[in-house]
Amino acid sequence: RTYIIFDVIAKYLKENEGFDVFYLQNITDIDDKIINRAKERKTSPLKLAKYFEKEYLKDMKGLKINSVTKYARATKHIKEIIGQIEKLFKKGFAYRIDDGIYYDISKFKDYGKLSRRTALQAEDAVSRIDESKEKRNKGDFCLWKFSKPGEPSWPFDSSLRSSN
């Protein structure tokens, strides 16, 4: 449903309002779900991610969703992702705990404005993935999960590894 809505909006803006729309869509090709399912299926996370990406693109074609200008795989932009997280960390919007780096929703006064929810209301929206009891606020979300032994990993700047 989400992709259909974005496709309709992009097409409307392009065809009816004359906007030059550049629609970039993320392809998450590595995360805990992919790693766990790859282990279950005795395959590599990369192979599994490519399989699901192929299936997803077939579905998009079948639904005639064709307004996406470019797809960006997360693993192809690790340096940029780390750079953005480092900026948030240095500005005090992110913090480190044992399992990863989290965004502190209480630091952004307009957090939830688009969804008409306050940071306190977001406390109710605890993610299945980000249930860590170490989080400062229940609504804080994970920006980066640290890898477990045997999982793919990417190095962070030493200032992030040593800071709390």
Positions of predicted regions on the chain:
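NTP-dependent nucleotidyl-transfer catalytic core
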Residues: 1-164
